[in-house]
């Protein structure tokens, strides 16, 4: 969840409905960027702790393979959970 209110009240600001809608859209885009950045940091934290034994000048093949697999699993799991949640929400709407 974000600290931003996605239903920002712009009454009294002099913003036209079109300007308010554009501001809402821009806010949603920025929230998505922030969520993506947070997810990348989460991948980095989890996979770094799992795969990096000792930092060096470059990654060896085992470490690189571990990082790729870790991120792939993380993404697959996130997508699976997201898809399942969407199915539950969709079933609830019917």
Curated annotation (Swiss-Prot):
The compartments listed are: Mitochondrion inner membrane
The molecular function terms in GO held by this entry are: metal ion binding
TM segment ranges: none
Q: Which UniProt keywords apply?
A: Chaperone, Disulfide bond, Membrane, Metal-binding, Mitochondrion, Mitochondrion inner membrane, Protein transport, Translocation, Transport, Zinc
Which residues form each disulfide bond in the chain?
A: 47-70, 51-66
Single GO BP term: protein transport
Coarse class of the protein's main subcellular location: mitochondrion
Q: Name one GO cellular component term.
A: mitochondrial inner membrane
Q: Give the domain note.
A: The twin CX3C motif contains 4 conserved Cys residues that form 2 disulfide bonds in the mitochondrial intermembrane space. However, during the transit of TIMM8A from cytoplasm into mitochondrion, the Cys residues probably coordinate zinc, thereby preventing folding and allowing its transfer across mitochondrial outer membrane.
Q: What is this protein called?
A: Mitochondrial import inner membrane translocase subunit Tim8 A
What gene name is listed for this protein?
Answer: timm8a
């Amino acid at each position: 969840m974000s600290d931003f209110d996605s239903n920002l009240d712009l009454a009294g600001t002099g913003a036209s409905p079109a300007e308010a809608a554009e501001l809402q859209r821009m806010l949603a885009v920025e929230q998505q960027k922030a969520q993506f950045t947070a997810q990348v940091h989460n991948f980095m934290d989890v996979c770094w702790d799992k795969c990096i034994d000792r930092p060096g000048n470059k990654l060896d093949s085992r470490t690189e393979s571990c990082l790729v697999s870790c991120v792939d699993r993380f993404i697959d799991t996130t997508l699976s959970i997201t898809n399942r949640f969407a199915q539950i929400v969709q079933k609830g709407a019917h």
